[in-house]
Amino acid sequence: MVELEIFEKLPLGGTNIREVPKKLEAEAPALCEKLLKQQVKKLKPQGASLPEGHLVLLLGGSNGILRAVAIQLLFGEKIPVYAVHYDRRMMIGGHHVKAITDLAAARGVDTRWFNADATDPKVIDEAVAEIKKKYKVVHLINGIAAGATKRYKELGAINVPDLDVAYHPVLQYPDFSSSDNIRNFGLVAVPLADDADIEKTNKFMGSSTTLWAEPLAAAGLLARETSIVAFADYDFEKDDPVYGMGPLAGAKILQRESMAKVREKFGGKTIRLCYPAMDTTAIGAIPGGLIMFALSTQVLAEEGKFKNLMQLAEETMEIFKPGYTGNELRADADFQACLPEMHRREPYLTKENIQEHLHLLPKLELP
């Protein structure tokens, strides 16, 4: 294996953070509106259906895979969606939400978004009270991604291979539209987690489903054997030096345990939504995340099996089709199958040839 140089991975691909709020204010509204209309124009109904008085509630949804799910539900299936997201002034999410709510209002589809901490009891109570005014049954999808992308300190420090990729200056996702945006391939350091990191990750990604299930059930909105309670999961490899050996892994285990409790206590139809590595803002923050996405995507594209966020959202609609009885949706089946070939290629990657090894990515419709 070629010896790789260590480089520092910067937030948003090294974007000047001080300039972000000004750039978003100037360019994001029009760009988010344009992108949404382009995506909605291509939507095809997938046959998802919910009875009158039913609502889908998303934890997350302003960006990434749950944004795509929200778009498909609202504009492809005409299903009402409420969401609780948390976006600060320098994040693109709030602008995506504005575009979604404006278009939904124009098309007569009910949606409401709360920009607040989804683990705050006051926020939960407020949202539940608002939902109860109009709806009888809630279906919950938890997509909170707010964990520490670090290793347990007892496992020690490590460097892992990763990419330096330019981000879209406004939409804030790793931008593979040009090979020139792939600027470096080398090693990045994996930070070590402290107790506060572990506690925060467990709160947001481990127990947050239970925080909502209790008050929803108390309000009569979580219907036994009817309400779907799902969470967006990543089925990491057990030997993954970051995801498999830090707070993210621990939180995912807690999340799965909490889902079992929801099923036993409230009779919720619990479903694990397994997604592949995806081209999102969040994956860029995970050491090793970008090379995992890029190389697996290259392999999948060669096989004609790559799916972008909107295509994965279409697949997610399966859980809302009449008669669906599964407890796990494997939207990552092709991704999991491609991992051996991806790992076979890894030793041959260098800083000099990385663009060649990822030559199909600029031809794909990302994210």
Segments predicted by a language model, with ranges:
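Non-catalytic terminal and boundary segments that flank Rossmann-like NAD(P)-dependent oxidoreductase
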Residues: 1-60, 71, 76-78, 88, ...
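N-terminal Rossmann-fold NAD(P) dinucleotide-binding loop
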Residues: 66-67
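A short helix-coil junction within the Rossmann-fold of NAD(P)-dependent oxidoreductases
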Residues: 76, 133-135, 150-151, 214-224
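Conserved glycine-rich Rossmann-like NAD(P)H-binding loop of the short-chain dehydrogenase/reductase
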Residues: 77-95
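Rossmann-fold cofactor-recognition segment
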Residues: 101-123
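Acidic, Ser/Thr-rich peripheral helices and adjacent loops at domain boundaries
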Residues: 102-104, 290-304
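A glycine-rich helix->loop->beta "capping" turn
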Residues: 107-111, 127-156
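Catalytic loop of short-chain dehydrogenase/reductase
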Residues: 159-267, 274-292
